[in-house]
Amino acid sequence: MAPKKKVTGLIKLQIQAGAANPAPPIGPALGQHGVNIMEFCKAYNAATESQRGNVIPVEITVYEDRSFTFITKTPPAAELIKKAAGVAKGSATPHTVKVAKLTQAQVEEIASTKMEDLNANDIKAAALIIAGTARSMGITVEG
């Protein structure tokens, strides 16, 4: 077995799917670790092509020899909630001004999408996490 490569950095970014380019914030974040920026952009765009229109978080692990690996996550819960509720952004004052409503079924659908990234044992616990995020955005959950 080949010797394990030494990790020199971990970069976390949230990038539009299929739209990574060397401009900020991607270029500077990768440049300071010596990563080939265009190589990452091409690989990321190819990996996220099917999810265009979503913001996809990515964790990039940079190694000593300037090579890298990356793991894409599911879109942020807030983005999925905004899309389901049909609003551009959450409420500026979430506890006084409500901007939209979600049904329990919509919350469970978002929870099942996010399940692999959430620290929850079952879909009910995941739905409660999503409902809490929605509440903090000024979106009420019915049911």
Curated annotation (Swiss-Prot):
SUPFAM superfamilies linked to this entry: Ribosomal L11/L12e N-terminal domain (SSF54747), Ribosomal protein L11, C-terminal domain (SSF46906)
A GO CC term assigned to this protein in UniProt: cytosolic large ribosomal subunit
MF-aspect GO terms: large ribosomal subunit rRNA binding; structural constituent of ribosome
Pfam family, one: Ribosomal_L11_N
Record key words, sorted: Methylation, Ribonucleoprotein, Ribosomal protein, RNA-binding, rRNA-binding
NCBIfam families assigned to the protein according to its UniProt record, in alphabetical order: L11_bact (TIGR01632)
Subunit structure: Part of the ribosomal stalk of the 50S ribosomal subunit. Interacts with L10 and the large rRNA to form the base of the stalk. L10 forms an elongated spine to which L12 dimers bind in a sequential fashion forming a multimeric L10(L12)X complex.
Protein name as annotated: Large ribosomal subunit protein uL11
Species name: Paenarthrobacter aurescens (strain TC1)
Gene (name only): rplK
